[in-house]
Amino acid sequence: MDIESTIGWITIAAMRLAFPLIALSLACLLAAADKISTSAAKDHLEQTATVCGKVVGTRYLDQSANKFTFLNFDKPYPDSPFTAVIPGENRAKFGEPEKTYLEKNLCVTGKIVEYNKKPEIIVTEPSQIKVEGK
């Protein structure tokens, strides 16, 4: 094997080893870039992102047909800039979310949609919610 072939082989081997590390680093950077404030959520409608803020108000509509649980962030309803909504059919996975998450700093991941001109994420799995500081 001549020197040029050896250098070429070493270059290819190094690139193969480096590629997974570069891809992992890029994925971490993109994940961090998707973390947004509750006030910025309105600018990311129809996008999947992680929205972070403090739950200052909650409401469980146990008498309604859909039995929604609402987690209102940063300001009490109706002034909350962002809401996480847990549908009734998923509620059992969360225990009592209106008590568990009240006054907690959370990050919620999912597709941001608009309802009544306000951004929200429909939360169907506990893995979509992370308590900050844990």
Please tell me what each predicted stretch does.
Residues 9-11:
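Short, positively charged and aromatic/hydrophobic N-terminal segments
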Residues 31-134:
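OB-fold and OB-like single-stranded nucleic-acid-recognition modules
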